[in-house]
Amino acid sequence: MARAVGIDLGTTNSVVAVLEGGEPTVIANAEGARTTPSVVAFAKSGEVLVGEVAKRQAVTNVDRTIRSVKRHMGTDWLTKIDDKDFTPQQISAFVLQKLKRDAEAYLGEPVTDAVITVPAYFSDAQRQATKEAGEIAGLNVSRIVNEPTAAALAYGLDKGDDQTILVFDLGGGTFDVSLLEIGEGVVEVKATSGDNHLGGDDWDARIVDWMVKKFKDNNGVDLAADKIAKQRLQEAAEKAKIELSSSSETTIHLPYITHGESGPLHFEEKLTRSEFQRLTTDLLDRTKGPFQSVLKDGGVAIKDIDHVVLVGGSTRMPAVTEVVKELLGGKEPNKGVNPDEVVAVGAALQAGVLKGEVKDVLLLDVTPLSLGIETKGGVMTTLIERNTTIPTKRSEIFTTADDNQPSVEIKVAQGERQMWAQNQPLGNFELTGLPPAPRGIPKIEVTFDIDANGIVHVTAKDQASGKEQSMTISGGSALGKDEIDRMVREAEQYAEEDAKRREAVETRNQAEQLVYTTEKFLDENSDKLPDDVKTEVRADVDALKVTLEKEDASADDIRAGVTKLGESSQKMGAAMYAAAEADSAAAGGSAGATGESDDDVVDAEIVDEGGADDGAEGESK
């Protein structure tokens, strides 16, 4: 049976985990790291780079490097590379493909199923886009799980007693707070709230703005207008933020950041932790509203919370820990989990639940936002309240607003505002063919059905005629099946091209190594080899070197040269063995001719020791 993995598809970093012997294991990537940067780049050669290699070349390839694409999920955002448009789903699929490849290399078997996590406050469109990204990457997404829920699953499953857990999840691009109750294998989400546009990227941006202002004040040059300089500033900002988590100050030093009238200019400034916290106070304040909202919605007092779990790399910032402590009235948050890995571990556990590898665990999640339709006057009429446990199904009867109305348009939205237009539209469809009737008479049953992934299905049915119309809400970013199929083919094509490039590089490396070892062997053993063998081998070495000098040499051409050199190299070995055997035979014959009488004496002694004189031999030993 193919293995299922748990994937935390993050804004800045992603993690993949798997169950081994019932225990979750985080899988290290091909580079040996347990987290993979969610960065995708297109090299000038057309190769797709993902992860650390993409991040490293970002400064020299700014326009073709994409990061933090998670912030665009569920929107109509596009990026153009070589006159080709890429959606957020496709970019995310490249990251997922790498995680899939690394997991397969670790496990030694195919990975087909995955549980992928999303922020609890992700809308329907964002969840749908995440599922599509998985499909494009060649994964069957068996479940979309909220990140805080996965974290609670990983943290609380083995604790035994009933407990109330609050998960404070501040990642690279999103923020969630969730309140959960765990007991006897049941993980139940009571309430959730958050901000899909608040995360570590925003803290980085404040440092970048501060650096740009400092440099402009000192040198009169605006670095924000220089793409390459801006990229260097972003990398330095992220590094400074991390350093300020453990140090009270850091020096940001960027030599040759740009050129001025008098020559090259350098950036060097000290940033203290207190100054950094002053720059980002308002960002911290934005975490307080969702925190209070969750406690209110869950009907739980601070004193009733047993544990607070910090999730996401951004919770390592001391100011974040302090604000959580302040919100909890001085209570220390739990630091017993790895904030970068706990979500993927929870996702792997949920994958195990779905595969039947983990028994007696039930995950009850909630919908983060209310769902409803537009009714007369543009009012938002809610059918499913936020924080309703999913999966769920609700129906209500509506009627027409005009006499003899032939059709009704069902306009669906997600949000908490009173007027439909102020909420996030999810989609609309029309129920046609209604029989003529005075207004208020027709009975139209509208049903909302939310599945375990949090994806919404809506049905409208006229009770008189039995006519029915339905749709799966998929938001503005939704891709049609044909588009997804096309993107899957493109992703496979990129994977094939990348595999060919990797094969070509490996073949080239193998050839260069063979040339080096053969030349070394020739130099060290030149006097022991016959001239005809040396000439043939040197000719093959030179021919392979000429092939390797051509940048456009195909793997087949290189392989042919390697095969030919391999065959002629074998002749060197054969010649060496033949020479060694001849020397050995000559040495044996010479010894036999000159030492025959001595040999007879020695033979007699050996026979004597091994036969009659055993006692003497024993004594001598």
From Swiss-Prot:
PROSITE patterns: HSP70_1 (PS00297), HSP70_2 (PS00329), HSP70_3 (PS01036). Induction: By stress conditions e.g. heat shock. Pfam families: HSP70. Gene3D superfamilies: 1.20.1270.10, 3.30.30.30, 3.30.420.40, Actin, Chain A, domain 4, Substrate Binding Domain Of DNAk, Chain A, domain 1. The modification Phosphothreonine is found at T174. Keywords: ATP-binding, Chaperone, Nucleotide-binding, Phosphoprotein, Stress response. Residues 596-621 have a biased composition (Acidic residues). GO terms for molecular function: ATP binding; ATP-dependent protein folding chaperone; unfolded protein binding. CDD domains: ASKHA_NBD_HSP70_DnaK-like (cd10234). Residues 580-621 are annotated as: Disordered. Belongs to the heat shock protein 70 family. Acts as a chaperone. This is Chaperone protein DnaK. The gene is dnaK.
